[in-house]
Amino acid sequence: MKRAFIMVLDSFGIGATEDADRFGDVGSDTLGHIAEACANGEADNGRKGPLNLPNLTRLGLVKAHEGSTGKIAAGMDGNADVIGAYAWAHELSSGKDTPSGHWEIAGVPVLFDWGYFSDHENSFPQELLDKLVKRANLPGYLGNCHSSGTVILDQLGEEHMKTGKPIFYTSADSVFQIACHEETFGLDKLYELCEIAREELTEGGYNIGRVIARPFIGDKAGNFQRTGNRHDLAVEPPAPTVLQKLVDEKQGHVVSVGKIADIYANCGITKKVKATGLDALFDATLKEMKEAGDKTIVFTNFVDFDSSWGHRRDIAGYAAGLELFDRRLPELMELVGEDDILILTADHGCDPSWTGTDHTREHIPVLIYGPKVKPGSLGHRETFADIGQTLATYFGTSPMDYGKNML
């Protein structure tokens, strides 16, 4: 029985890539800077001491980081016995965003340039805004700018509740984000508005990767909170991913846990499981792994590393999240059967010590574990697509156009 379990620790980079200068990210290092802060006693809020990740270390995380950066992460064990195969991978795609990283992991790098709304104020074309107001029968809109999602709620949340005007905003990513109150505006109405925005952006040729629904609750600035009902409307990958090939060619199964289905625009997904928060995502993953049959991929995105701690530049929160993940990792490893493979990886970096609030261009860890996986270094990988090609070889689908088999 062949099964693959893919765990994406969203934004868990392990050191700047060779082309990081193109992105202003030279010196970024999500793992390294978190470990450094922990070792220096600068991340003792809600946790304490050096970064403690013994299970990820056994799978080769510290070695992969050393390969990427040339140094051992502060306070971590560079001499621990390694029981998995490990690598550090460079991104071939032109961006450092979520769809590009995930699509490349599945064998389809993004070699075109996304469209962006680069103006920090009055970010969106008036023609687009007018169409959204007309089609969705809106009283107007708020925002129309670059912003952090939590900051803009404090700034505009109360006005949104009074006026019913949705909050439109963007970032350095190829995104159009819409924040609305779940109760006063309504979740279904928000989703409908996002569908309209997705249509207009596609028909208008803006080449925007994602429209993101950002529902929130609360009644005044300071207590607004985003809920777990986020929904991403992505464009479809430009070619069949290894997920699609497993389903189409082998009548296999692909289980999405978390936001995976949204990222791939449901292409190659046979089952969707929603869960919010690190523990809930872990629990849902364990359940699906226990139930998975032959020719199945269980694919989970642990979004909190990115959304709750990376973008918010919360080093202590990120460290605590990693330590929670590591404590629960043996539960996953126990479910890996004789012919199974477990792959732990990331889609980009989001260094919580870095300036600004955006992603960072970094190598990602590729940690592969299974009874038949030979432990040791798989070296520097030129593309995340090596993961997709490895899966294609493992399941016996037709080969991907990019990437090399690592096993």
Curated annotation (Swiss-Prot):
Major localization class: cytoplasm
Matching Pfam families: Metalloenzyme (PF01676)
Cofactor(s) for this UniProt protein: Mn(2+)
Pathway: Carbohydrate degradation; 2-deoxy-D-ribose 1-phosphate degradation; D-glyceraldehyde 3-phosphate and acetaldehyde from 2-deoxy-alpha-D-ribose 1-phosphate: step 1/2
InterPro entries in UniProt: Alkaline_phosphatase_core_sf (IPR017850), DeoB (IPR010045), Metalloenzyme (IPR006124), Phosphopentomutase_DeoB_cap_sf (IPR024052)
Function description: Isomerase that catalyzes the conversion of deoxy-ribose 1-phosphate (dRib-1-P) and ribose 1-phosphate (Rib-1-P) to deoxy-ribose 5-phosphate (dRib-5-P) and ribose 5-phosphate (Rib-5-P), respectively.
Entry's family note: Belongs to the phosphopentomutase family.
Protein name (database record): Phosphopentomutase
Organism per entry: Salmonella paratyphi C (strain RKS4594)
